[in-house]
């Protein structure tokens, strides 16, 4: 008997702790022999939106490791959908390494009232909330422990006046630690986009991320492989600088039907560095964007 749909994976607050918790629970309820049964449903942990927010679809962007361009992909997805007329927001959950504001050229701190926090908007109307927009000096480090970071991520959901938003992208830090777990437990995530790169080692790391979404019972909408190839400007031939990957094999093995491959294009990171990600006009994420639009 499966316990997946009756467990919210909140072992710390479980009223019926089992031996798995003492040994380090891996949240693999389907293969657990204990079936705690005292944790309640997954929905019990979801945090409510406030009265000033009507977010229709929450999409988490994750990667198994850093340095694959996850925040750049998040920014590009938000920008493209905004240009198509959708109301879009980005919750920057990478609290200690935020880069979303820089991609959009947003430097002004967020405003707040006694009731809520107001997101900043990009030139094209993408709403953004980030830890960097709380600091007096955006180069100051945030040196916090996990529970405090997780608490701020939840506040970005419960205390921000998001307004009417069709798609809220949650840009998560790399890995499968505290913040992804908090996001998957606290927010009504409709699906996940996994960002990766072509190196062999990455396929193993991608599988870790995909397996986490399976354990949390959240579908993977698609995989984005960044830096997949380089197009010669003289002959238009594709060159696989890092070798051809097996991302399609990984996708098939987990029944993921959507893969977008982004070329190495120096123009995109240069625009992000200038805060002009919305000026990038190449259509490199069409497959994933079309999959996301089906949620609307």
Predicted regions and their residues:
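C-terminal lobe/tail of nucleotide-utilizing enzymes
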Residues: 2-43, 210-296
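Pre-Walker A adenine-sensing motif
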Residues: 44-52
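Glycine-rich phosphate-binding loops of nucleotide-dependent enzymes
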Residues: 129, 172, 185, 291-294
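Phosphate-binding/switch loop-helix module in NTP-utilizing enzymes
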Residues: 135-183
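Inter-motif core of Ras-like GTPase G domains
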Residues: 161, 180-201
